[in-house]
Amino acid sequence: MLRTLALALTLAFTAIPASAQNTERAVFAGGCFWCVESDFDKVGGVISTTSGYIGGQNANPTYENHPGHREAVEIVYDPGRVSYEALLSAFFRSVDPTDGGGQFCDRGHEYSTAVYAVGNAQLAAARNAKSEAAQALGGVQLATEIVPAPQFWPAEEYHQDYYTKNPLRYRYYRSACGRDNRVREVWGSEAMAGIKGS
């Protein structure tokens, strides 16, 4: 009886860390949120991704009504497995940070790149990562904004995990939009570094 109780308690306490992990958040705007979500779901240490809107004028934005908002992805990650700095490096190398008018075939502010820092430590790390990315690209001016994170609003359910729900449409869109080709043009051998299977 005591052995059974001890075993049950051991199993219960070893299960706690999995459900009560130490997690942190990162928020990146990198053009179409379907693509950013797909890319970061492949990064080890990322626990979840959520497509949404951030930085605009209205509460509860929708795809049809999100003035001033950018499409963005909120990333929940385990800092014991992946650092914020590694996420930043992967982010910069998965977009064209020199383009201030949008990303790839998607044009306009809502598709422009930004890092929304959650706290001062992330703000400093993001500024450093932007500087390092600019140097890696030969000292060019980067258009990616680095700003404190306001409220993040999750997008409609049909946008979540779009690449798994509609794989053919997603692959067609990503290819036709020229995302991967442009990232390779900008970054060369560093393109998509840190993102598995890319």
Where is each model-derived feature located?
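Flexible coil/turn and secondary-structure edge motifs
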Residues: 2, 19-198
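Bacterial N-terminal signal peptides
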Residues: 3-14
